[in-house]
Amino acid sequence: VGLGDVYKRQIYTCLKIDEVNNLGAARIRVRSLLSAIRVREKKHQERKIMPTNLNRVIFTEEMRKDYTILCPQMSPIHFDLLEPAFRSCGYNFEVLDNDNRHSVDIGLKYVNNDACYPSLCVVGQIMDALLSGKYDLHKVAVVITQTGGGCRATNYIGFIRRALEKAGMEYIPVVSINMGGIETNPGFKLDANLLTRAAFGAIFGDIFMRCVYH
């Protein structure tokens, strides 16, 4: 949860103080805060406190039968091989092909620009696809890896859920692929068959990438 969620509908400013001695940027932020407060007072806007908690939607066995699982494109050669690997295990798995500037712009609308660039790409691809009208929003799910480490990649799943909530699509399940049991879903299981096929896809992806970029 970011500051924007904690202080939702309240005016706040975030000051970043590092090793430099020039506080010009901090002064500008404070002036902007004061200006925003004055504007709000003139408009007599009423504050409404909103809850910031998100309820996780479980991906069930029933959903597995007819739901399309969307996966953001994060490595073109590898993921083109992973898609058939997941499909062969009974998942209607689709790797998105919209990794372009437009999806990044969409990502900027739903993710704080202080987040890392890959998170903008990932969330942007997903939201661009869901907003395109191509998919039945009540028969679609999203999948994302969750490392469990200190990198923000662990929090991509939270970014996605927050974006879905902002777009009024909080009912769409977001499935976590992780090896640490962080989240589990009855309709999505990393069994030996799937892991073996995914491993082969990753290995051949490395081989093909080495040949292409040699």
PLM features per residue range, with description:
Residues V1, D5-H214:
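An N-terminal assembly and electron-transfer interface module characteristic of large anaerobic redox
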